[in-house]
Amino acid sequence: MLMGRPEDSRVKIPALVHFTRLGYTYMSIKDKECNVDYDGDTNIFYSQFLSAVNRINQTELTLEDAKKIIGELKIKLDNDDLGKSFFKILQSGIDGIKLIDFSDITGTKNDYTVVTELPYENGDDNFRPDIVVLINGMPLSFIEVKRQNNREGILTERSRMERRFGNKIYRRFVGITQFTVFSNNNEYDDSDIEPIQGAFYASSSYKRMFFSKFREQREDELKADMQSIVTETEEFVLSDNNLIAIKGTPEYVSSLSEKSPTNRIITSLYTKERLLFLLKYGICYKTTTNKDGITEIEKHIMRYPQLFATLAIRDKLREGVRKGVIWHTQGSGKTALAYSNVQFLTDYFSKEEGKIAKFYFIVDRLDLAEQAKNEFEARGLKVKLIKDKEAFITDITNPGESNTSGKVTMTVINIQKFSKESVTKPSDYNVDVQRVYFLDEAHRSYNPTGSFLANLMASDRDAVQIALTGTPLIGDGYNTKMIWKLYS
């Protein structure tokens, strides 16, 4: 007789086996003791954490050293900041010790492990996610699955998770969780207003969780990371979950397909290179003040069009294309995309071209300049708002200008502030600057016969120009894609 819930045999177990295709290790936790094998306050596994940290940093830390670091992480996770303090450490390290090697796409330094039904406990309260994804022993993500054709399952699970994440007793677990996946292994029904069926992902939140669909656009490059299922590993997963009897059944074989909805989103989000990219560039915190003067923090994860736009920009830059249009971004997604690319392109130009990137967000209305300024500052950028043409002339003719805040600067400017005089000059210093122009609403105000576009093009002939629009114009003499070509 088969044991467990229907979603175990139809969704969870096939998903666990699929993770092994991606190079993850399945670990049984039947013999793992809380506060012996892992820290019960954070669910960080000592052995995986210690081994990975030593490999990454070429150190010989002891178990006690590792526990001290975890203790410091615990203090950060106690903050009422949705894990922002912890995230900074995840990105940059702590006391000179890196917790993740973001360049290790082969998995020789980082540790990639999945477990099932790991208790998230605080006193008498607990919950056990179906699949927990451990990166270097840290539970950075988890997956909840429901049986197929259960139209209320996803909404019910979201409500349940919102109650848990809003409960202060789970604050540390909310902070360490970077994003979650919820799936009932059905295809999306695009007629549904609410996320009723399909596989969705969301960043952690104290309040409402926003579920996003994921539609893969780069399947071929992900196939290269796919491995064959090892029979012994598959049987270990099945026997560890008391479901060895389902092996070979039509339902199990079908659910094991790499093309199932659950397995597709796992491939898209958890392939090693993709996951490292998301953890490095795909997550941001937005801090705002509400009408009552209370500071609110939101955690955002890239929507899939923003992810693929960023990868397209990278690919085109490597091909030597220095200007292009991103045509499918809409609303506030454009500022979010620009923010993510500030982080990404800062590293890209530093590592691949040895240049210091300098960023400009160009709008065609004063109200949009103020709006963009607020959006970028809320995400943590230092913003320089150009007030007049003279200020821009000073800015663009001073390649060595920098700030001492430690933050990357985004210069926000109205297109009308470009003039014949605002042209770059060679540096008097040994500074190789790469200017990057983000052009908001690129279907407006950039007539190829007008002076605005001419002044923009002349300001820096070597600038990278990324035009953002939801409605590219195509017509006689005015074709957005002819001006900037096509990035994505």
Where are these regions (language model features)?
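Conserved motor-coupling elements within RecA-like helicase/translocase cores
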Residues: 391-411, 428-429
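Conserved helicase motor
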Residues: 366, 386-397, 415-420
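Hydrophobic positions in the central parallel beta-sheet of the AAA+
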Residues: 361, 411-413, 437
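Conserved hydrophobic packing residues within short motifs/helices of P-loop NTPase cores
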Residues: 360-362, 466
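ATP-dependent helicase/translocase motor core
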Residues: 2-10, 14-358, 367, 371-383, ...
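Signature of the SF2 helicase/ATPase Hel1-core->accessory helical subdomain module
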Residues: 150-154, 162, 192-212, 419-425, ...
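Structural recognition of the conserved hydrophobic beta-strand(s) that form the central parallel beta-sheet
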Residues: 182, 411-414, 464-469
